[in-house]
Amino acid sequence: RQRQMCIRDRFTGIVEEMGLVEEVRAGPLYQLRIRGEKVLEGTKEADSIAVNGVCLTVIETDARTFTVEVMPQTLNKTNLRRIKKGDRVNLERSLSLSSRLGGHIVLGDIDGVGRISSIIRKSEQVTMKVQPPSRLVKYIASQGRIAVEGVSLTIADLWEESFVVCLTPFTLRNTTLGLRREGDLVNLEVDVISKYMEKLLVEGGIIPGEKVSEEFLRRAGYY
């Protein structure tokens, strides 16, 4: 049987399942042993799995669990250090050449940690307001995409220092966002296209040094 070719470190933000953290090994080499089912299918050592949106390399597998190693710099810029035994985590395998792109391109490289400032429940719909680090605000646009804990979401509303996403019943049931509470910290990855656009537009001298905002992109013809 031919080996499946993987596009390394590319994800969709469509969580495949919630895993259960069975062991946290702290120390010079910080490791997490996680129980899963679907993500174990075809997974072997050196493959990539996104854990709460963080791309991590599998170093061990058995019939029920896999182990990933977390580098110090990753611990410092994500919320993985807060994970405890018994916690649920979002899991997604890296894209293969046959994968459908159901969400948006996610790299698994967290840009920062945001804080949930409010959760409002109306009937079956839940809206979540998140305050991101100020340096990320320029990359966030209304109706754009963002990955929260590895979940691809559409930005429903945008405020000066926060953004709002709507969570469907399916998302609440099948990801850890249904377990989150006000004040919780969440991993954020902005749409990589916005960062590429900033680099191209600023370096191209279209409007040198100007903040890339929704209004700026509209003037530049991207809306």
Residue ranges of predicted features:
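Conserved loop->alpha-helix
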Residues: 8-223
